């Protein structure tokens, strides 16, 4: 085929040798946000397909995730208790950015929560990582308090198609067991908006 270059000249191109470019993160994010929660036979299978839509792999070896990112696993932060392994649905490790780790022993994988909220939260950690180069950019800090999980929930609801009611149920349950870091509010919503627009610094 013949194409015209920026210089106005005509060039002949062999179309049979063309390549398909990997979608941008914006394209992948929109693909996930628009996707149904019923992509496979059952909730766990649907959640896995949702992760794959983002060009990421779902691994059931959550211990490997903890080995790859020990600093992000099981660390209490002030009044916010860290989740134990038996409480952990999934895990995103920045050292292995193309993998979401799932804890298959959690019953939530068999519920609508898995595709509608759980994996969309984990994919939002990846989204923030892609946009800011870290899962904890300055934008998530509120008066010296790390709001990573709350901002990630807000991002999941605003940009990844997460079900707000199911996210809120998980927030309420987590808070009842001492894990208050997942709550959403006006700050986390604003921070998610800023991060989505590429503003990763403190606002």
Model feature map: region roles:
Residues 44-53, 58-61, 135-137, 163-175:
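Surface-exposed patches in mature extracellular/periplasmic domains of secreted proteins
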Residues 114-126:
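Short alpha-helical catalytic segment bearing the HExxH-like zincin motif
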């Amino acid at each position: 085929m013949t194409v015209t270059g920026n210089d106005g000249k005509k060039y002949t191109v062999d179309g049979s040798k063309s390549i398909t470019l990997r979608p941008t993160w914006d394209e992948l994010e929109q693909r996930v946000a628009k996707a149904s929660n019923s992509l496979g036979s059952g909730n766990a299978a649907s959640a896995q397909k949702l992760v794959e839509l983002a060009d990421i792999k779902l691994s059931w070896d959550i211990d490997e995730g903890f080995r790859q990112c020990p600093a992000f696993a099981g660390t209490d932060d002030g009044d916010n208790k860290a989740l134990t392994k038996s409480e952990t649905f999934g895990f995103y490790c920045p050292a292995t950015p193309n993998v979401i780790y799932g804890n298959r022993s959690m019953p939530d994988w068999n519920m609508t929560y898995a595709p509608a909220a759980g994996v969309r939260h984990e994919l939002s950690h990846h989204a923030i990582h892609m946009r800011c180069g870290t899962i904890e950019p300055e934008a998530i800090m509120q008066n010296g308090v790390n709001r990573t999980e709350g901002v990630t929930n807000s991002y999941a609801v605003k940009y990844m198609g997460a079900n707000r009611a199911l996210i809120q149920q998980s927030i309420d349950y987590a808070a009842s067991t001492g894990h208050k870091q997942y709550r959403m509010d006006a700050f986390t919503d604003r921070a998610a908006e800023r991060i989505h627009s590429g503003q990763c610094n403190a606002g």
